[in-house]
């Protein structure tokens, strides 16, 4: 058996095509969704990510609002830009590119963001809404995983999903999505401190690997026919980016989301979805207010 690929690039392209139509409909109402980014410093990797997000915006008609500060920026200077983006009507959603320079209170910066403009879906208010099953921005990578599985017909309803990782971006937040009634999965959360990790993995219908440990998931850990999504990022001895899933897993699993090319494009697409949905919610609220007035 050679696994079929969960193609994030093609699935993300389909999402962008749908967003293009939705953005055009908003523009017809006089509303242009806008993605804001705050980049502090000149880290090449961070700049590459930010530039990629704005290229995605251009593809679907979303406006770009770019804010940059030097790595010498103070806490107060960074917070001033956050307040400006909160108040900017052209910005319907934004992100603060992480990591921020040493000495900056990152949590304080993120908590200052307007939750209604939380494009990453990781503001404490957004995560709280997810716990309470209320409408709000969804965490981009977990939602990207769900959409990627659905697009390829991988059954989530009733599936046993093993998540490996405990970071807020993926590990802690994806069980919240997968256990909603709309997904209806049973989730076991593991991490690098889990005893006998392999015994948990071998029971999984779906594995989401997000520990950041090179080739942590090996072929002998995977149940034949399972779906395996590689979301982990680390570097080998040569500095090359590698994932959490050993290449040999493709000979056991039915489906594999590779890294790169699997979940990554879906994360970027979901960021755009959050920006557009924020604009749609604002438009609906404005229409309701006008009707009531």
UniProtKB/Swiss-Prot annotation:
Keywords: Amino-acid biosynthesis, Histidine biosynthesis, Hydrolase, Methionine biosynthesis, Multifunctional enzyme, NADP, One-carbon metabolism, Oxidoreductase, Purine biosynthesis
Any GO molecular function: methylenetetrahydrofolate dehydrogenase (NADP+) activity
CC terms in the record's Gene Ontology section: cytosol
Pathway of action: One-carbon metabolism; tetrahydrofolate interconversion
Residues that, per the record, bind NADP(+): 165-167, 192, 233
Role played: Catalyzes the oxidation of 5,10-methylenetetrahydrofolate to 5,10-methenyltetrahydrofolate and then the hydrolysis of 5,10-methenyltetrahydrofolate to 10-formyltetrahydrofolate.
Cited PANTHER family: C-1-TETRAHYDROFOLATE SYNTHASE, CYTOPLASMIC, C-1-TETRAHYDROFOLATE SYNTHASE, CYTOPLASMIC-RELATED
Protein name, as recorded: Bifunctional protein FolD
Organism classification: Bacteria, Bacillati, Actinomycetota, Actinomycetes, Kitasatosporales
